[in-house]
Regions:
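Glycine/proline-rich, positively charged
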Residues: 29, 42, 88-180, 184-188, ...
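Active-site beta-loop-alpha junctions enriched in small/polar residues
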Residues: 21-23, 55-57, 81-85, 117-120, ...
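Conserved, mostly hydrophobic/aromatic
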Residues: 6, 18, 37, 52, ...
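Structural motif corresponding to the early beta-alpha repeats
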Residues: 71-94, 118
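Alpha-helix-loop-beta-strand connector modules within alpha/beta enzyme cores
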Residues: 65-81, 133-143
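N-terminal binding-site loop/beta-alpha segment at the start of enzyme catalytic domains
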Residues: 1-76
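Structured C-terminal cap/extension of enzyme domains
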Residues: 40-45, 188-319
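Short, well-ordered coil/turn segments that N-cap beta-strands
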Residues: 9-16, 48-51, 72-76, 109-113, ...
Length: 319
């Protein structure tokens, strides 16, 4: 496993970060037993992953807690999150703090390494900032070590929230969407996070766009019809197979993880899974060498103008 320092924090994290939400949610959404889900986390730890990301809304914090029982807490980096708003309500400071306390209880830990404000949309950013002073008081109590923020990628393709967050100099860590077909963060944001030494976690690297059969082909067809991609892409037997020629990648998902992993400004790559087989494959991809320079050039040439592609909410969101 490769490890990096997460921005200006003193956290040394694995470049592969196990995401416990999304459509996979450690197999919870596909009916796996709690023990099976716990074993996925344990196997990730056995393979050198020391960075685990969850959230109160995922319903997987208790699973994470059981997986890390009796392990050296100082060797594991835990990231969790709480929403500040939903479509129906705004969470008060006391409700967010209660969520923080519940996270500690569910995982049976004394502190959280990174506590994020979760899925903050641009319209809710100011409200999220109003909660920060109160949360920093909880930080002083030792409940969490670093404050982070994650964007709501499906409603914020311009990544306005992360841009604003960087300007506040309040957040130690940010989580943003980045992929082969969604490179918006390269234009300014990654330069800004690097300049300010803000820890940067990448999500939406694969998601359903690349993992659900037929989804990528449908998206490419739509983009070609909208004149955003060249027509010859429709002539390929498999979607984006031209990228794999002499790239070093085994398949498009392998290419996705490798592209994100070696993007300057990104510290770690989040991946989700519901099986140990996929867990091993994902980690292997993230630890593989950079794609060939010619392949990277093609990715940048054909897709760097796209925005908001592949940014969809998980098909199942746990309540």
């Amino acid at each position: 496993m490769d490890y990096v320092k997460l921005g200006k924090t003193d956290l040394k994290v694995s470049v592969a970060c196990l995401g416990c939400g999304g459509s996979s949610a450690l197999g919870v959404t596909s009916g796996k037993s709690e023990n099976e889900s716990v074993n996925i986390v344990k196997e990730a730890l056995n393979l050198g992953v020391n960075f685990i990301d969850t959230a109160n809304i995922y319903g997987t914090e208790k699973i994470v807690g059981k997986a890390i029982t009796n392990l050296n807490r100082d060797e594991i980096v835990i990231s969790t999150k709480h929403q500040v708003t939903t479509n129906k309500k705004k969470y008060s400071l006391s409700e967010v703090i209660n969520g923080l306390n519940n996270s500690l209880k569910y995982m049976d830990i004394d502190y959280i390494d990174v506590f994020h404000l979760h899925g903050v949309s641009p319209r809710d950013f100011d409200y999220a900032m109003s909660l920060v002073p109160g949360l920093l008081k909880e930080k002083k109590k030792g409940k969490f070590r670093y404050l982070g923020i994650t964007e709501s990628a499906p409603v914020d393709p311009e990544q306005i929230t992360i841009s604003k967050a960087i300007d506040t100099d309040v957040f130690d860590v940010v989580m943003l969407a980045f992929s082969i077909m969604n490179q918006n963060a390269k234009k300014q944001i990654l330069q800004q996070t690097s300049k300010k030494n803000i820890g940067t976690m990448s999500m939406f690297v694969v998601r359903s766009l690349f993992s659900v059969p037929g989804r990528l082909k449908d998206e490419i067809t739509k983009l070609v019809n909208d004149q955003k991609l060249p027509k010859w892409l429709l002539d390929e037997t498999e979607p984006l197979e031209f990228l794999l020629k002499n790239s070093g990648a085994k398949n498009i998902i392998d290419a996705c993880y490798r592209y994100a992993r070696h993007q300057k400004g990104i510290d770690c790559v989040l991946f989700g899974t519901s099986s140990i087989e996929h867990l091993k494959n994902n980690i292997k991809s993230i630890l593989s060498p950079q794609l060939s320079l010619a392949t990277v050039k093609n990715i940048d040439q054909y897709f760097n103008h796209l925005k908001g592609v592949g940014l969809d909410f998980p098909e199942k969101i746990l309540k």
